[in-house]
Amino acid sequence: MDSVISAASVIAAGLAVGLASIGPGVGQGTAAGQAVEGIARQPEAEGKIRGTLLLSLAFMEALTIYGLVVALALLFANPFV
């Protein structure tokens, strides 16, 4: 039974990282594209747009890091074993 739990934990860890990176990846691509469009339309607002973009990218990246933390917990501090 322990081998089944270990195998399921490895699969769940892979899914946690994979699924946790899909949303932020799409969001970061969209945000960067919109920022480039905004800077092209209003070059004088470049500093404000860039600052907002970097802050929002950091928040989006935090979601991926949370998925990584869950995956590491499943692999090394498995609560199911």
Curated annotation (Swiss-Prot):
- Pfam (any one): ATP-synt_C
Cystine pairs: none
Signal peptide residues are none
Entry annotated with the keyword Cell membrane:
no
Establish whether keyword Transport is in the entry: yes
Write out the annotated subcellular location: Plastid, Chloroplast thylakoid membrane
InterPro entries per record = ATP_synth_csu_bac/chlpt, ATP_synth_F0_csu, ATP_synth_F0_csu_DDCD_BS, ATP_synth_F0_csu_sf, ATPase_proteolipid_c-like_dom, F/V-ATP_Csub_sf
Query: Where do the coiled-coil regions begin and end?
Result: none
Task: Give the record's subunit note.
Answer: F-type ATPases have 2 components, F(1) - the catalytic core - and F(0) - the membrane proton channel. F(1) has five subunits: alpha(3), beta(3), gamma(1), delta(1), epsilon(1). F(0) has four main subunits: a(1), b(1), b'(1) and c(10-14). The alpha and beta chains form an alternating ring which encloses part of the gamma chain. F(1) is attached to F(0) by a central stalk formed by the gamma and epsilon chains, while a peripheral stalk is formed by the delta, b and b' chains.
What's the stated role of this polypeptide? F(1)F(0) ATP synthase produces ATP from ADP in the presence of a proton or sodium gradient. F-type ATPases consist of two structural domains, F(1) containing the extramembraneous catalytic core and F(0) containing the membrane proton channel, linked together by a central stalk and a peripheral stalk. During catalysis, ATP synthesis in the catalytic domain of F(1) is coupled via a rotary mechanism of the central stalk subunits to proton translocation. Key component of the F(0) channel; it plays a direct role in translocation across the membrane. A homomeric c-ring of between 10-14 subunits forms the central stalk rotor element with the F(1) delta and epsilon subunits.
What family classification does the UniProt entry report for this protein? Answer: Belongs to the ATPase C chain family.
Q: What is this protein called?
A: ATP synthase subunit c, chloroplastic
Organismal lineage = Eukaryota, Viridiplantae, Streptophyta, Zygnematophyceae, Zygnematophycidae
Name the gene behind this protein. atpH
